[in-house]
A protein has these predicted regions:
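Charged, low-complexity, intrinsically disordered terminal regions
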Residues: 75, 103-105, 109-123, 170, ...
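Short, highly charged C-terminal tails/helix-capping segments
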Residues: 206-220
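Hydrophobic ligand-binding cavity/cleft-lining segments
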Residues: 2-95
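Glycine-rich portal/gate segments that line the openings of hydrophobic small-molecule binding cavities
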Residues: 84-142
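Beta-strand/loop substructures that line and gate deep hydrophobic ligand-binding cavities in soluble
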Residues: 133-203
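Short C-terminal domain-edge/linker segments immediately following a structured domain
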Residues: 92-95, 204-209
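Amphipathic, hydrophobic N-terminal targeting peptides for secretion and organelle import
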Residues: 1-2, 220
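Polar/charged side chains located within well-ordered beta-strands of beta-rich proteins
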Residues: 64, 99-106, 119-122, 130-134, ...
């Protein structure tokens, strides 16, 4: 596993975006994406709704933030039930929300197995970007040290929203802190995308529509 650059910096001082870009530029690491989904186009093509729905950029961003806090709800297929815990939530005057998170997630190359994932999370509300920085260990709100599983490299994920208010585009990319690029990891990501219904459409969007908007979806 590559050296962890994130564990020592205090939460308020740590620059999530800078760390993500540093890792994205490192030739040793394994990148996937960026991936792009036109939300309304996909909904219209693959689903019938119980009431009229124009999914907005505001909704998409709300979905991203809720998923950040509750991955066990919005990406339930990847999270061990009961394993999520968050702490340290802070909000700055310029619309930046920061917290830390631990959960047990399916491993990328052994999805039948779960491993502990420890993450620094920052949501930039003004530009609608949320960054997840995997780290080897953090001290939680109880003063205990929580440590990530070492069976796979640390990874970072960035999600953001683009497009017009009534034509939102969801985008994301990942970076795995490997010793050298691993071509198997992009294949694993491709397999995950293809497992969604429809393929490539993130499961957290239909979950949000049915759970938070109270609109039922029926596949076409």
């Amino acid at each position: 596993m590559s050296k962890d650059h994130t564990a020592a910096a205090p939460m308020a001082e740590f620059d999530h975006e800078r760390e993500f870009e540093r890792a994205w530029a490192d030739p040793r690491y394994t990148r996937t994406g960026p991936f792009t989904v036109n939300v309304n186009e996909t909904l219209q093509q693959f689903f019938r709704t119980s009431k009229p729905l124009t999914f907005t950029r505001t909704m998409m961003w709300d979905n991203e933030v809720r998923k950040g806090w509750r991955p066990d709800i919005y990406i339930a297929s990847a999270i061990l039930p009961g394993s999520v815990r968050n702490w340290g939530g802070t909000h700055s005057a310029d619309g930046v929300e920061t917290f830390e998170r631990v959960s047990k997630q399916r491993q990328w190359l052994k999805p039948q197995e779960y491993g502990c994932v420890v993450e620094r999370v920052r949501a930039y509300h003004q530009k609608q970007t949320i960054v997840f920085i995997g780290t080897s260990e953090l001290r939680d709100d109880r003063g205990a040290v929580v440590r990530a599983d070492t069976k796979q490299p640390l990874f970072y994920i960035e999600h953001w929203v683009e497009g017009e208010e009534n034509e939102p585009v969801a985008r994301w990319r990942t970076i795995h802190l490997t010793e050298r690029p691993n071509p198997v990891l992009p294949e694993a990501m491709k397999g995950m995308l293809n497992s969604w219904k429809p393929p490539g459409f993130p499961e957290f969007i239909p979950i949000y529509i049915e759970r938070d908007l109270n609109i039922k979806l029926q596949p076409r």
